[in-house]
Every structure is written in structure tokens, then in C-alpha cells.
Amino acid sequence: MEPPSRHAGTDIIIEDARWRASVPGTERAIRRALVAVARQGGPDFTQSPAPSILLATDRIVKRLNARFRDKNKPTNVLTFEPLSPMHGGDIVLGYETVRREAAAARRSLRAHLSHLVVHGALHLAGYDHHHPGEAREMEGIETRTLRSLGFGDPWRQGNWQQAGSVRI
């Protein structure tokens, strides 16, 4: 495991070196996504505690998913609510699943990572996608945020499936 990297108040822990090898400037991409989502109406982590980000393997995500959701399989992103007012929560991403989804959707790994960081940050801020109105609002913020970062609309490109993302 590499030491945490601090950007904009966010602890970024890269458990799997393939993240850095596949997404040059990984930490900067994450920081940019968090700043961009605030500009589009999402959570502003300069005003509240920022989340910790763990870039992990599917094996780690599978273990967490089994322990906290009783689902013995990996997923793309898990979010964990803050345990105290001084903590911003946690966003955990599984490398193999995220890479596979990006390839299937014909998107860069950087674009998909940015999308899932934004998605996780919105979950931590209380947004959800279980009802059509909530989903439209959340997807709208995600789309505006990703466009501001120079990426296309994640809901119109490729085969993106939100079903794998979960909030705990």
C-alpha cells in the first residue's frame, strides 16, 4: 500500500498501483472531480469534511460488499457514511470492475474514475437514485460536472450501469 496523498482535504489511499499506472495524475483527477462537483451544485468539501478515497482491488471491494451489504461480489464503488461530524465518509473503488466498465462503455479510465468519484461524493451528500426524480437530479449534476471536466455525458455514452454503485 502506498502512503495517503492529501489533496483539497481528501485522503487518497492507492491500495493497487495499477490505478496510478492506468490513470496518470490519479490524485489530481480525483481532486478535480471533487472541486468540479461543488461548482455544479454538489457537496463543497471546502466547507465540510472531505471524504477519504480508497482505490482498491475488486478483492477488497468484494470483502467490504459482503461484510456491509451481504453481497459476496465486487462492485464499482461503495460509499460509507461519515462516522462523525469531523469525517467526510469514505468512497471505495474496485480497479478491475471500474476498468472493465470503462472498456465496455468505450470510455477512458480517467473519465469513469472521475464519474464514480462524483457519484460517490453525491451519495455522501445525501443524493440517491432509487426514485426517478432523485435519479434525474443526481444524473444532472453528474452530467454537468463531467462536461465541465471535458468528458461526455456518462448517461448517453456506452453501457454505463448505475446498479453496481451503492451507498452504505
UniProtKB/Swiss-Prot annotation:
SUPFAM superfamilies: Metalloproteases ('zincins'), catalytic domain
Gene Ontology MF terms in the entry: metalloendopeptidase activity; RNA endonuclease activity; zinc ion binding
Alphabetical UniProt keywords: Cytoplasm, Endonuclease, Hydrolase, Metal-binding, Nuclease, Ribosome biogenesis, rRNA processing, Zinc
Cofactor binding note from Swiss-Prot or TrEMBL: Binds 1 zinc ion.
EC supergroup of this enzyme: hydrolase
Residues annotated to bind Zn(2+): H119, H123, H129
GO biological processes: rRNA processing
EC number: 3.1.-.-
InterPro entries on file: MetalPrtase_cat_dom_sf_prd, YbeY, YbeY_CS
Metal-binding is among the record's keywords: yes
NCBIfam families the record matches: rRNA maturation RNase YbeY
Entry function: Single strand-specific metallo-endoribonuclease involved in late-stage 70S ribosome quality control and in maturation of the 3' terminus of the 16S rRNA.
Family statement: Belongs to the endoribonuclease YbeY family.
Entry protein name: Endoribonuclease YbeY
The species this protein was found in: Gluconobacter oxydans (strain 621H)
